[in-house]
Amino acid sequence: MLKAMFGLTLAAGMALASTASAHGPSRQKTQMTITLDASPTEVWEVIGHFDDMSWHPAVASTEMTPEGAPVDVPDESTRVLHLKAESGDPTITEQLMKIDPDKMMYKYMITDVAVEVLPVTNYSATLQVSDKDGKAEVLWKGGYYRGFPNNDPPEELNDDAAVAAVTAIYQAGFDALAERFGKVE
């Protein structure tokens, strides 16, 4: 009887262990803020247009698709970001999910990107400008999964690679805004 109970306990433990290791990736989150030496309205005027990402140094051009599509209609406005690159035409396609000009905020999601360009899947983010003692505080936060959805991802598609890539994008954008407006320490 004792052997049978030990066997059942061992089998149950092994089943639980294999289930725990087979859960797949966890949603990652990146949230960054910067306070700029400008009014919130001045900064929103630069970054609040879904059809214009020219303020970000990685973006060569922004194209609304299809041509003539609305620029500020949630679930309809779609942009294609053409990225600066030495070869090829890497792109990221994003759809507007929500926009609130009064709150100086919009939410968007990536609908198409090659993991070689950005090693993430199911990415959505919010970009918002708030007033902080008369200065502009910019919040950029996103949630996403790594580029490889299964267990044992290659190094370039793991959680660390996804977080590093998104952090680098946000930081490059913030650095460009700080250069343009000045950063409040």
Segments (PLM) and residue ranges:
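Short, low-complexity Ser/Thr-rich regulatory SLiMs
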Residues: 98, 127-133
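Amphipathic hydrophobic-ligand
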Residues: 26, 118-124
